[in-house]
Structure formats: structure tokens, C-alpha cells
Amino acid sequence: MKYYILVFSFFILHSSAINAQGLSKLEKKVLELVDSRNQESIDLLKESANINSGSLNIEGVKKVGAIYARELEKAGFTCSWISMPDSMKRAGHLVAERKGKKGKKLFLIGHLDTVFEPDMPFTPFTLVNDSTATGQGVNDMKGGDVIMIKALQALHAQGLLDDVTITAYFTGDEERGGEPVSVSRADFIERAKQAEVAIGFEGATGLNTIATARRGSSDWKLEVTAETGHSSGIFSDRAGYGAIYEAARIINEFRTALSAEQYLTFNPGLIIGGSEIQYNASKASGSAIGKDNIISPAVVVSGDLRFLTEQQKENARAAMRAIVCKSLTGTNASIKFEDGIPSMAPTPGNETILKVIDGISQDLGQGPSVAGNPGSRGAGDISYIAAYLDCVDGLGASGSGAHAPGETIKLNNLPYLTKRAALLIYRLTNK
């Protein structure tokens, strides 16, 4: 038994070590530069976090974009602003580019906006202790933006971005995307198609955990109508079961039929039923009037559906439609689906990029890196382009409480995460 344990342990250690290649002299210089500029990283984070850039705050999003453009120009990038139609009420996106002929063509992803709108209480950048800071968007995702930018600056200072092709794309409405998506993500998708590898700097779920897959999301709306009448007749062939019982049957059958499937979730977020109902989809709200002795003639239920692959999404939709069709007596139900953000399905190409990251984390003394659980992340901008190129995400800041007033970032992890990003960019563009 001891022999097998030793052999197995050796196999794991040896397999992980294969990806490590050791640090070159140039890489060591980059790491030293990152360390020497760590205070600059914190200062840039503070500067950008102290500007409210909620998705609907057009002026604030543009101000953060101007700060990042200033810093990216220091790394030799040419910056431009992609405006959105006035009717969309979104600021637009920042694009920074360098063009060359060497190595992989990279597409780096950040976003300028946060969930914190101007009408919410403002939380300035504040040091909690010597290793932690709080502030709006420090974790999601201004910390990740800073990691990307400072990694690029460190590489540029050593001349390691010469003749490479990199697009750094910062959307201005990731948290609350402009509609229609066919317009708000058109430029994003077209530029990504020209690259070979996409790297997302959303928050890290662990120092050694990388997202090689992310679930997609879509919406659904269930509508039920039914015969109405006095409650004394409910369950009879004449009166039937009413809309509320039918809606309850459908939702419960969704649960019993599909809830055990890995990575598939479906959540009824709003339900309205009664004698008279009003539903406002744009505001995700509604109202109802009903009496205890009247059989409900109408119900509306809205919810989301999250999935790992397009096939899983389509299979789930087919199963849900089949459940809806089995109407109880005196009722009629229909369900409609609306696509949202596609999934970032796991692929061999994504795993190949993970192996590069694994080698880097070991070279930096942090141990092996592994793929994270796709179920622990929601959908993101990278999912719009996952069908066109190899993708990894989660290379951003380490912290907690994203989207909450007490959102934090672990400043003591900032140097390592910046070094990891810099070496990943360098190794991919020098293959």
C-alpha cells in the first residue's frame, strides 16, 4: 500500500512539474519591476475606484476609461473609444491595441463599470488593514483591470511587447449590458475574432483556480390561463384546477425532472397570480388582485436558466416545454425562452492555456493551477466570444463581497497576480 501511495504521489508531482519551465533572466527582471511598482498599482486602483462608474453613469465610466487609456498609452498602446447609440444610454467601450507579427494574438478583457450606481451610498477606497482594502469595484473588476494594465507596463518597460499583437478591451456596460446585444457587443465580437487567445481578468476565485468554462444564461417566461369560478368547484371536471395549481405543478416538475443535472440551474424569480394580474417585464415587477373564493384564471412566472453548453440549454428547454404541455384540466400554459449570454464551454484549447498558467504558477512557487468549477461563476463578456477562440478567465483580483457595499481586495496578492498575468502574456506572445 505504501508503495502505491508513493508512486501515485510521484506521478502527480511529476505531471505538474512538466508544465514548469523555470524563469528566464528577462522574466526575472519583469518580476522585479512588478514588485518595485506595486505602490503604483495600489495608487491606480485607488484613483479608479474613487470614481463612481455604475453602468448607467456615462460620465463616470468615461472618466475611468480615460485613466486606463492614459496608463495603456504608457505601455505603447493606441487607444480608441467605441461609442454606443444615445438611445442605449451606455457610455461605450475602451479599446487599446498593439500590432505585430510575433506569437499568439491576444484579446485581454476588462470592464470599466460596476454595479454601484450614483444613487447608491458611495464607499471610497479605504485600507482595512495592511493587506486588505475596500471600495466600489475594487474586486469586480477594477482590481483585475489594474493587474492587466500593470502587467503590460512591466513587459513594455523591458521591450517585451515589441512586434506583438494585443487588444485590451474594456467594456463599459458588463454589469448591465446595453440592448440590443447585437449592437453593444458587435465591435467586441468582431475584434475578438481576429485574435487567437482571450484572457479575462474577472475576479479570481482562488489563487490557483482558473476558469476554463463559464455557464451561459437565458430567460424564460411561463404564462398560464385557466377557467375561473367559485372556489367550491375547484378540481371538478367543469371548473378545473385553476392557473395557480397549474403553475405550481409545472415549476415543481421542472425541479423533479431537471434539478439533479450538473451545471444546470433554473430559478423562478417572480410569480404573479390571481383574478387580475399586471406584469411589467422591463421593471421585473407586477401586481395581482385575487379573492380566496375565486379560482385564479391567470399566472405569470419569470425566471432564468443557466447552462454549461448549448446542447445542455436546448435539452433543458425541450424538457421544460414537454412539462408545460401536460396541462391540468381547465388550464392552458405556454413558455417562451429568450437567449441571454452564451456559455463558455470547456475545450481542449482552453485546457492548453491552463497548462501554460500552471507552469507559471509553479515557476512562481505557488504550486499547480487547476480548472475551477463552472457552476461557481455566472456568465460574462468572455462568453460572447468563446466560440471563436481559446479562452480563460478569472485572472483578476483576489477578494470577496463582489457587488456588495463591503467589497474587498487582498492587496497582498496583487504582486503575484500581476506577475502571473505578465508571464502569461509574455509566454503566449513569444511561442
Where are these regions (language model features)?
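Bacterial Sec-dependent N-terminal signal peptides
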Residues: 1-23
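Metal-dependent amide/peptide-bond hydrolase catalytic core
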Residues: 21-27, 70-71, 87, 227-431
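Acidic/His- and Gly-rich active-site-bordering loop/insert found
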Residues: 21-136, 156-160
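Active-site metal-coordination/substrate-binding segment of hydrolases
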Residues: 103-170, 191-193, 405, 410-416
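Short glycine/proline-enriched loop/turn "hinge" motifs that connect secondary-structure elements
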Residues: 116-118, 160, 212-216, 292-296, ...
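Short, flexible, mixed-charge acidic loops at enzyme active sites
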Residues: 117-127, 213-218, 281-286
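Acidic/histidine-rich catalytic neighborhood of metal-dependent amide-processing enzymes
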Residues: 141-217, 276-283, 430-431
